[in-house]
């Protein structure tokens, strides 16, 4: 099967930021996306920057095609400055965690759409439990034949991104012991989770052809890998990160993803064979980061060397500094180092729960406040 990749001549950025809708008083989920759209979209200069998702308790705020992290953040901010007040009119808040700490999946309502209906019809119990939210970052790729090499090498940084963004420690009222319960929930869907590490684009084309012929998917977008090509728009899409509560953490993570992809693609274009790890190391790293977050000891190379994820991260931030300078995101990349200092979202949520004697409403409050504080 032929899949055309509409290459992007520049390493442009696009960001998709998912939010849960929570009630102002109870802090439980509200299936009110339709009402929020009705309030917010007429006020938006570009209504297409606010999307529906699988469940009616979810909205997605998206940027346009941007050239810098700062431009993408400003674009998202402009949309949120309309959507958040529209939520105020409905006694709704936007919640940026990877999971909700106490909501029940049994009362959530499905959004209208054939694709969503088919997903639930096929996946049943697991699909209905997808009370999860994340951030997706697209980076433009100039050459189709480098996409799979960059994708495979980017998986070396899966645990770093997972640990930094982890924001889903509590599920159904219980602390799971995981920094990112979302990561392990989402991979229960049959086409989600870690990607296959193909060497050539033709292998990816053959895979998609097999999936279509056997009825596993109806369209390419149903391949829901943690990192995947987006051929129609010429990007590599990074879907590793949990939901992010505020603009500060988001700008740092987007800068890191932008720099990583551009660095790897530049090296591949220069003829370098990019470093990769065997799938069993990649799989183990994902589990370790989901379980231990910033305390994870991760495998760093194909020779099975290991290191604390934050120590390894510090070296990569230093190495990527010249890339960030070229991309105009030096300040945002430098702020990545502050996430472990401040505490990742999963750590901040646990601290609130401990301080309040396990009050999960207070946990939701704290996540909501972070978004509002960042908007000013």
UniProtKB/Swiss-Prot annotation:
Enzyme class label = ligase
One GO biological process term: modified amino acid biosynthetic process
Family stated for the protein in its record: Belongs to the glutamate--cysteine ligase type 2 family. YbdK subfamily.
Could you tell me which species this protein originates from? Nocardioides sp. (strain ATCC BAA-499 / JS614)
User: NCBIfam families under this entry?
Assistant: gshA_cyan_rel, PRK13517.1-2, PRK13517.1-3, PRK13517.1-4
Purpose of the protein: ATP-dependent carboxylate-amine ligase which exhibits weak glutamate--cysteine ligase activity.
- What Gene Ontology molecular-function terms does this entry list? ATP binding; glutamate-cysteine ligase activity
Name this protein carries in UniProt: Putative glutamate--cysteine ligase 2-3
Which Enzyme Commission number(s) are listed? 6.3.2.2
- SUPFAM superfamilies xref list: Glutamine synthetase/guanido kinase
Against Pfam families, the record matches this protein to: GCS2
Could you tell me what reaction this enzyme catalyses? L-cysteine + L-glutamate + ATP = gamma-L-glutamyl-L-cysteine + ADP + phosphate + H(+)
Specify whether Ligase is a keyword of the entry. yes
Q: Which UniProt keywords apply?
A: ATP-binding, Ligase, Nucleotide-binding
């Amino acid at each position: 099967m032929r899949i055309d990749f509409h290459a992007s001549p520049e390493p442009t950025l696009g960001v998709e930021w998912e939010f849960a809708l929570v009630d102002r008083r109870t802090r439980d989920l509200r299936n009110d996306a339709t009402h929020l759209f009705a309030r917010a979209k007429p006020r938006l200069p570009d209504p297409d920057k606010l999307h529906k998702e699988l469940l009616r308790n979810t909205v997605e705020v998206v940027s346009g095609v941007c050239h810098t992290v700062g431009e993408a953040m400003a674009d998202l901010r402009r949309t949120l400055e309309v959507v958040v007040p529209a939520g105020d009119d409905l006694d709704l808040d936007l919640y940026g965690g990877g999971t909700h700490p106490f909501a029940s999946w049994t009362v959530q309502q499905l959004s209208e759409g054939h694709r969503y209906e088919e997903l639930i019809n096929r996946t049943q119990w697991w699909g209905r439990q997808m009370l999860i939210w994340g951030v997706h970052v697209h980076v433009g790729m100039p050459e189709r034949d480098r996409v799979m090499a960059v994708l495979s090498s980017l998986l070396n940084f899966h645990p770093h991104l997972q640990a930094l963004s982890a924001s889903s420690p509590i599920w159904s009222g219980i602390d799971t012991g995981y920094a990112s319960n979302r990561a392990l929930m989402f991979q229960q869907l049959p086409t989600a989770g870690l990607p296959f590490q193909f060497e050539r684009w033709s292998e990816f084309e053959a895979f998609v052809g097999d999936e279509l012929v056997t009825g596993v998917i109806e369209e390419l977008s149903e391949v829901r890998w943690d990192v995947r090509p987006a051929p129609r728009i010429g990007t590599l899409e990074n879907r590793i990160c949990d939901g992010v509560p505020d603009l500060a953490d988001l700008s740092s993570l987007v800068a890191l993803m932008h720099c990583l992809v551009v660095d790897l693609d530049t090296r591949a274009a220069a003829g370098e064979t990019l470093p990769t790890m065997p799938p069993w190391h990649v799989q183990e790293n994902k589990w370790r980061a989901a379980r231990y977050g910033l305390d994870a000891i991760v495998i760093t190379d194909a020779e099975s060397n290991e290191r604390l994820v934050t120590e390894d991260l510090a070296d990569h931030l230093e190495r990527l500094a010249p890339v960030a300078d070229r991309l105009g995101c030096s300040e945002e990349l430098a702020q990545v180092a502050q996430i472990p200092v401040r505490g990742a979202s999963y750590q901040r949520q646990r601290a609130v729960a401990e301080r309040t004697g396990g009050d999960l409403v207070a946990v939701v409050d704290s996540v909501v406040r972070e978004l509002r504080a960042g908007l000013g």
